[in-house]
C-alpha cells in the first residue's frame, strides 16, 4: 500500500506525553511538524524545537490560534489535554479543534481518544472523547480514531505516583484480577505516525489499541520477574488519595471492576509488529 510522508502535520498537545511521542515519530519518518503549545517559548517547547519541530502558539479555547496553527497543514493529530473542569469543557475544546480542522480542509485528522468503545460509561474523560469523535464524524472529517485503554507508563512514570495509584489504589477499586488492555505511549505515537503515512488504509477506522491484556496481579508478577523485586507500594487512604487525583479516575477504576473489558491484540500488532507487551516495556524501562 502506498505510503505518504513529507507534508506538514499539526500536533495538538505536543508538549504532553502523547503529543510529544507523536511529534517524535513523525519527525523520525520525515514529516514536517507544527507543534502546538500554549507556551511555545517554554522548556518543553524549546526541546521540541531542538528536535526539528516548528513550535507555535495554539490554545483549544482560542479558535483564531487554531486557525493560524492549522493553516496549510495536510494532517492534524488532535486530542484534549487532561485537566478540563467538566465534560462540557472537554467536548468544547475538542470540537473547537474539529471545527478548525474543517475550516482548514485538512486531508487527515488522527484523533487521540480513549476508553472501551461506542457506549457512554459515566467516566467523564472517556465520554467526552466519544462525543468529540461523533462530532468529528458529523463534520465529515477524514478521520482516524485511536482508542487505547490504559498506558503502560502508569506502572513506572513517577509523575503518575504508581506506588499509590497503579500498585495500590487502582487494584483496590478496579480489582487486582481484572484484565486490562495496555499500550505504551511510545507505541501510540508510532501508530499515529503510521496512520498519517497510510491515509487510505486508516481513514474511517476506529482502532481499539492494545499490545497486551493483563490484570494488575499479572503485571505485578511480570514486574517482579523483570526487576527482581515487587513494584513499590505506598498505602494511602482513599480520602487522602482523592486530594491528588480527579474523582473521574476513581470512577474509571470502579467502572472497570463492574465491566469486564477484553481486547484482541492482533490488530495492534498488524499495524505495529514491534509494539511492546508489558514484559518488553518493563525491560526497556529498567
Q: For each of these PLM feature ranges, what is it?
A:
Residues 35, 47-50, 271, 281:
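Acidic/proline-rich low-complexity IDRs
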Residues 52-53, 143:
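Short, conserved active-site loop motifs that form the nucleotide-linked donor/cofactor pocket
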Residues 58:
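Cofactor-binding loops of NAD(P)H-dependent oxidoreductases
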Residues 2, 202, 226-227, 234-286:
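A hydrophobic C-terminal alpha-helical subdomain
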